[in-house]
Amino acid sequence: MTPKSHLSQIAASLHLDACGACSASLDSTLKEQLRNAGPIPFAPSSLAERLDPSALLRDARSFFVILFPYRPAREEEGNIALYARPMDYHKVIHRYLQKIIETARPSYPGEQFLPLVDTSPMVDRWLAYAAGLGFFGRNHCLIHPTYGSFVTIGSILTTLSLTPDQPLTLDCG
């Protein structure tokens, strides 16, 4: 079993079915887009910090990216964003990522793992796109073919070499 399929199997045992992998060497297209975007609220102003996974984990080689769908079973009235209604998703996702890491770690002695939610400097939507988990809509949201844009994103930065997935070639019109 490959490391990627092992991580996917662990995620599936936790009922997480939207997983993929991408290289920790970030694409030049992303670098250009970030340069042109200018300052982004809640993100580090330094492009180098947003584009250098090895600043977070030395010898990082891959990201294992997981989507966490959050659309409720029924629509509720209200003016609070759907992702903000349940428990703090940062804590929930972090617990799932830690469980995956704890389960995988004994199989990969000497390898390192770092759980990331959207509080890291990494560009989580781009990682999910690069890992084949969705495409960008006109609104710049990541859209998954099944879950739509009702997802939050978590990833595991690792020194493991994971076979990268291909980005989806879909669009919304």
Explain the meaning of each model-derived region.
Residues 1-172:
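Auxiliary alpha/beta "docking" domains used to position bulky ligands
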